[in-house]
């Protein structure tokens, strides 16, 4: 029975194991991470809701060794197979740090670099390579170094190529937080990219930058209002290309829009990490400059033991590294520090004994200095065709100024804490509170400047859109009124006008979609304004297109081209809609299934316009007889098109319903869009729907259960058969069966013989014979 029970338990355990997904991160909303700040309980990322949680045991604080960090990852994530750890590339801001033994947690944030807890087999990070940037990698199988070492290698490699380090990731793990290589992306310097932007301003869409407050502030806290990183919006930049139609007598150019995807810009202003962009003539010069720098703790407040080269002493000395920022005179061990700086600096010191030192002062690896009027300079400059380039430069100047000011405050904070070590506890607390208020003040000031910058840019973009649309409409009307009108020229002007209206509508919808995601309350306030504007665009296009049929000869000749143009516009609108309402898939595994496009219900109906839109010389034309066309009864449309579904094709054939739409026939606009905002996951601000398992995982689990069920049933049947057979088997003890027909005397004699009795008569005759 025991072997059968063992098989039964083994089969049940196997079936249970088959239900567990093989992907270690499957079904997780966030990546497993831990963060430490000495004097506070450790924090770890809740992989189910994307929030930072305090240490579950209420006792663990900062850990000094990488082995201890790995063990702690395994403790806080027991259900995951944590195999390694690695430092994150960027610091984060975390609030609600708790002290040991206290129930109340502080709400003010701290800047720290978390550790990523790697699940399962190591997989290198997927790096995005922006335009004009290069992807590079380095591997050395004889080297096994830390994250910091490979970060330095990547940064120096980009500096040698006169570029900036954009992003990087580790390759080939060889120990705990140790690797044999690095992959990284180098991008052109700011000055070069500015020149490229200025030269290509006519080919790129103007973007609206929405600033970048750290979203990690908003982990459900109601004590601090945080500016959410906002997306860029596309503005209008048109491109003329030659019309290769041989029938166009005057050779007018046709405007073709260079459509580019809608970009996201979520720049974190709390990241004070600096980038070295110094180009050097030799490796020795680079090392000499690095080793001459003073030790910098950086803006973060961790206490990591590191080494730096002290030029005055001529040897390496220990210091505490905060975890982010700082400079490259920062080494893990004294041996590594001396290996890099010892020989080069000794040669440099020998040279200085023979000749005076004429080298320039050491340059701190911070970003380029910025003027204090970064925003004022942009605001004083009038808008022009290079609005995008001017806005980008103003944005970069503003961020550089903010980083410099934050770095200065952090250095002052560090110095104040060093001097306040011997002060009473109340004075220390006052110092900390003073600098916290100063940091918050700088953040608020930067947010206000960003908002002012964005509002100005938005106003200029809208003015540019209005001017181009007005000019396109005037050219279209002029072409229709020409004597005689030229059909090809009319079509070209109509095409430009439709593109201008399309850009206006696209700009409006994307702006509203952005506001809807980051601030539903504000979106509800501006909803009527947005829909009224869409209504005006719709009416204006209807009346402008109906004017085409005032000239029947022209309308009939270019009818096919007009239909194709409007169909293309409809397809483009559908694509924009799909991109707008499809929610992003956020998962570190294959369990997160987002709702399909058909499951996301967003209906928009048209608002009534107070008063009819009027334009000189524009009157709808009804001579083609619209009575034969069914009335438009549908009002629900996709939000990108902002027109009734039956009219979205915008066919302009006579009697299509385009020329006889009246204001009073259009019902009141309603917006049935669900304004979703999930504060639990602040990166995308949309409600995410996750299923327990995807289809592939369900199939695997079902197959495993079936196999396990068959094995269990087989074991049970075999066990029962064996038990039954054993129960009915005859038991023999060596007794000879006696025939029931014999007499009692013979039966008694047989029993006596079995017990050893021998007949004396038989024994006598046997002895006689012998």
From Swiss-Prot:
One of its GO terms (biological process) is negative regulation of cell population proliferation. Residues 194-207, 228-264 have a biased composition (Acidic residues). Residues 194-284 are annotated as: Disordered. Residues 756-770 are annotated as: Required for the interaction with KIF5B and for anterograde transport in axons. It holds the Pfam family APP_E2. Zn(2+) 1 binds at residues 183, 186-187. This is Amyloid-beta precursor protein. It comes from Macaca fascicularis. The gene is APP.
